[in-house]
From Swiss-Prot:
Belongs to the orthoreovirus sigma-1 protein family. This is Inner capsid protein sigma-2. It comes from the Viruses. It comes from Reovirus type 2 (strain D5/Jones). Inner capsid (core) component. Pfam families: Sigma_1_2. Disulfide bonds: none annotated. It is found in: Virion. Keywords: Capsid protein, Inner capsid protein, Virion. Interacts with protein mu-NS; in viral inclusions. Gene3D superfamilies: 1.10.287.1520. GO terms for cellular component: viral inner capsid.
Length: 418
């Protein structure tokens, strides 16, 4: 059904006393313009680049995603105070330029002389509680597209959440023909185009764009775990990965008439998220969650079960609740094994090819782990030396998150969708 509740959740502090962002990071985020709602800003923090490191301040593809979540989590607590005053207090050195939240600017001297707002961690806010958003549905949609995306990252201590739905009714109308227009394009390119479409105008609930986005997500995830491939497609479609296990996997929308999987009637869906920290370096997983955020901006997705999220994320209207859908986690490297096992059983991959891919996956994971842990150590050292200017460049993680997790069960749950 169409979305009626427009709540969003702010970031946790990861053990720090304040939002994990400082003036230097905030300035870097806003270097292209002072509005965090600009389409260019939104697509920028999705980060479509293939490189694992982009700059010292933005070392991974997931860094800008997390940092923008921190920036919005702090600055939006100014107008969402009970009195809704928007320009009398600053976050860091920033204030909103207008009550319509058009942009962020350096606070004037009188406000700079006053203490900054002390933002709170893990708060849920309702867009309709702020009068200027409640009165402008179109602007609220554009804002909520991004607030949905950061909520999908902030609900847990792991990676961003994606929604996967399989329903034959989604293929009605001209969706198949429109999907053919993306034949030969990468998942990243398709996601980029759909994000632009969502930002330009609200999607109708279960309209063509919303249905096509859900189909693209289902094709990606069914391909990601090896359920569909060139010998077992979903209505002739699947995503072909050119170098599975590589640091920069590219998934290309492909077609094959060899064999189509038998799809059961009905509507089946689940939520999935990477639990290992190397999601930070996987643009495809980030884009999948961003597309889910686009869906959330216009449609009310099923609730995520309270037992799948921490206490601070439970019973958020429109997001989590009792009796909701289970949130399935997986370890990125382990999912490569699930993918290879299925393709080998289906005769698409030889044992030698699997060994080669898994060896590449091991090398890639170790490289990513070394980088992420080095950056985390640098951030910890910086925060101890600068207690009044703390920050994290990537979302905090623990060593336990590198464990195998529930990957096999998650892979089976995705496979069971068809």
């Amino acid at each position: 059904m169409a979305r009626a509740a427009f709540l969003f959740k702010t970031v946790g502090f990861g053990g720090l006393q304040n939002v994990p962002i400082n003036d230097e990071l905030a300035s870097h985020l806003l270097r292209a313009g002072n509005s965090p709602w600009q389409l260019t800003q939104f697509l920028d923090w999705i980060s479509l680049g293939r490189g694992l490191a982009t700059s010292a301040l933005v070392p991974t593809a997931g860094s800008r995603y997390y940092q923008m979540s921190c920036l919005l989590s702090g600055t939006l607590q100014i107008p969402f105070r009970p009195n809704h005053r928007w320009g009398d207090v600053r976050f860091l050195r920033l204030v909103w330029s207008a009550p319509t939240l058009d942009g962020l600017v350096i606070a004037p001297p009188p406000i700079l002389a006053q203490p900054a707002i002390q933002a709170q961690a893990d708060r849920a806010y309702d867009c309709d509680d702020y009068p200027f958003l409640a009165r402008d549905p179109r602007f609220k949609h554009r804002v909520y597209q991004q607030l949905s995306a950061i909520t999908l990252l902030n609900l847990t201590g792991f990676g961003p959440i994606s929604y996967v739905r399989v329903d034959e009714d989604m293929w009605s109308g001209d969706v198949s023909q429109l999907l053919m227009n993306y034949f030969g394009h990468t998942f990243a390119e398709i996601a980029y185009t759909l994000c632009q479409a969502s930002a330009n105008r609200p999607w109708e609930h279960d309209g063509t764009y919303a249905r096509m986005t859900q189909i693209v997500l289902s094709l990606f995830w069914l391909s990601y775990v090896g359920v569909i491939h060139q010998h077992n497609t979903y209505r002739t479609f699947y995503f072909q990965c050119n170098r599975r296990g590589d640091a920069a996997e590219v998934w290309i929308l492909s077609c094959s008439l060899t064999h189509s999987a038998q799809i059961r009637a009905g509507n089946r869906s689940l939520f999935v998220m990477p639990t290992s920290p190397d999601w930070n370096m996987d643009v495809n997983l980030i884009l999948s969650s961003t597309l889910t955020g686009c869906l959330c901006s216009g449609s009310q997705l099923p609730l995520i079960d309270n037992n799948s999220v921490p206490n601070v994320s439970r019973n958020i209207h429109g997001w989590t609740g009792r009796g909701g859908n289970q949130l399935h986690g997986f370890q990125v490297r382990r999912m490569i094994t699930e993918y290879c096992d299925r393709l080998r059983r289906d005769g698409v991959m030889t044992p030698a090819q699997q060994m080669q891919i898994e060896a590449l996956g091991d090398q890639t994971q170790q490289f990513k782990r070394d980088k992420l842990e080095a950056w985390a150590l640098e951030d910890d050292q910086y925060n101890r030396a600068h207690p009044n200017s703390t920050m994290f460049r990537t979302k905090p993680f623990t060593n336990a998150q590198w464990g195998r997790g529930n990957t096999a069960a998650t892979s089976a749950a995705i496979a069971a969708l068809i």
